[in-house]
Amino acid sequence: GARTVVVATEPFPFASIASGDNHTCGLTANGTAYCWGVNYQGQLGDGTTFSRNAPVAIGGGLRFATITAGSYHTCAISTDGLAYCWGQNADGQLGDGTTTSRLTPTRVTGAPAFTSIVAGSYHTCGLTASGTAWCWGDNVSGQLGDGFPGTDRLSPVAVLGARSFVSLATGGFHTCGLTAAGTAWC
């Protein structure tokens, strides 16, 4: 079939965007989140599983500072530092203590305030202002850094090693942290 190109412009001047396997989310300058694309797992966060060809507002009035997308889930940090996730949760990647998929933003449980958040295919990690990394979700390859590869985590766990990071990056099944000295730990 024919492909459709969606151009998200006014009233959606985005300050940042993130893409998962088949969905994209953007944040406006005032922190409003909009998502579009495939929504079979609720990754758009609009309370449905209907796919959308145009951006739809999500969050019920929540304002976000940053947003990230995994394969079939989305996570964001609210302007007050709280982590929210939605979409597929088969491996605990939403961090709410369950494996229940969520159609709207749901608070990550047991997490400190984060300044940034990143998502791999089926796992998520957050970084605190002090540089501590926390991860949750799929751990088949040890991507959570908790010393227990193969054990999924339904809530955030601190990455081992007592290292302080300035940024985190995720791939499908791995996570890396960058220290202030420029050393990468994966």
Task: Give names to the regions the model predicted.
Residues 1-7:
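C-terminal edge beta-strand
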Residues 22, 31, 71-72, 81, ...:
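Short coil/turn segments that connect the beta-strands within blades of beta-propeller domains
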Residues 12, 50, 61-64, 100, ...:
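Short coil/turn segments at the loop-to-beta-strand junctions that recur within blades
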Residues 8-40, 49:
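An edge-strand/N-cap motif at the start of beta-rich repeat modules
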Residues 34-54, 84-104, 136-155, 178:
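Short glycine/serine- and acidic-residue-enriched loop/turn motifs that recur at repeat junctions
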Residues 23-26, 35, 73-76, 85, ...:
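Conserved core positions of repeat-based scaffolds
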